[in-house]
Curated annotation (Swiss-Prot):
Classification via InterPro entries: DEAD/DEAH_box_helicase_dom, Helicase_ATP-bd, Helicase_C-like, P-loop_NTPase, RNA-helicase_DEAD-box_CS
Motif Q motif per record, residues: 48-76
GO biological process, one term: cytoplasmic translational initiation
Protein family membership: Belongs to the DEAD box helicase family. eIF4A subfamily.
Catalytic activity: ATP + H2O = ADP + phosphate + H(+)
Domain of life: Eukaryota
Keywords: ATP-binding, Cytoplasm, Helicase, Hydrolase, Initiation factor, Nucleotide-binding, Protein biosynthesis, RNA-binding
Annotated protein name in UniProt: Putative eukaryotic initiation factor 4A-2
Keyword Cytoplasm: yes
Keyword Plastid on entry: no
Amino acid sequence: MEAAIVGQRQKSDDESGGDGNNKDSNSIAPSAIAINSKKKQTTKDIVTTQGAQFISESLIGETQTKDLDKPSAVHQRGIVPLCNGLDIIQQSLFGTTVTLCCGILQRLDYASTECQALVLVPTHDLAHETQNVIGVLGQFLSAKAHAFCGGTSAHEDQQILSTGVQVAVGTPCHVLGMLQGRALCPDHIRMFVLDEADEVLRGFKDQIHGIIQFLPTKTQFGFFSASMSHEALEMCRKYMNKPVEIIVPRDEELEGINVKQFYVNVEKEDCKLDKLCGLFDTMEITRSIIFVNTRHHAKSLTEKIRGKGYTVSAIHGGIHQRARDKAVQEFQSGSSRILITTDLRGIDVLRAPAAIFYDLPTQPVCYLRHVQSGQHGRKGVAISFITSTDERVFSTIQKFCNTQIEELPSNVADLL
């Protein structure tokens, strides 16, 4: 099934009333465009991949190791409008962080050290993860990003920005304070992006409106979300100039998931660790990613599993980049067979045959994202630990995924 797509022409002063600013509720209704319509590309380092995605040569070396040389539906649909400078609204379950980061990296002027892109997210963890994604994808371009989430003074923020931060990532309240306090100069910002836009607009509507008032009139907008309420969609349109609107159907995104899903009944929380160790011994899992819901649980479970004699690493929003890189390298090299992580999103470089939900995510979309982590169409298994308190959420997840998750069979070792 093709995504629903409506589009726009490139902004110009003539089209927006003479001053380049058409961010109001009277925006012209979008006109239909074809997904594979060819647009003239004058930049020499832009190449096409599978006829629908544009990735710069400078990014190719890095993205090939992350399966972006085989773009997903969401990558194909989102990156092209971003690279062409168009406003975009995209609703999809997977890939939004990578899509928006690729688009930003190809729109930056690397001769300038001014802040040129502003990305807002609802949580501190997602801000740090987005910073990490830009750092990894943009390492050959010398792109510099920083997460601004509070805990720093206006002077400290200014000092960080003065080092040449080209992409500022942050939470709405703190970023608005930076703009009001003149710690962040908006004059050179050319892209304004919301990830998890539905949640951001629902919880920080006034702050978003305040931030937009500081932006240059020709700023490109990109709003991305796994879900999009009618109210949020109308708010997006209010601020944009004839946006490209992309809705990737859920059934299309689910087609690439080739993972067998099971659950394990656990009497109480204290029994989970023994169940987990039993799985390791029974299944002889070479590598597994274990998902928990909080940083504290990630830290405590890491120590408990390590105490059982297993090699384990952990990544979450509370660790520094160097420690995160070390944990990923250990897992990729095989020196650590277990990786414990929280609800982090971004570049999926971690391939593992098993995903284990030690804590069941409270949001179905988080479950789906984790199920497809590291698979890219490859076979795998996902196992959820279910206590009596998880039953309602577990039922919601099954309905959302349109699947019946079965109890883990005794011959589980044959599944890998």
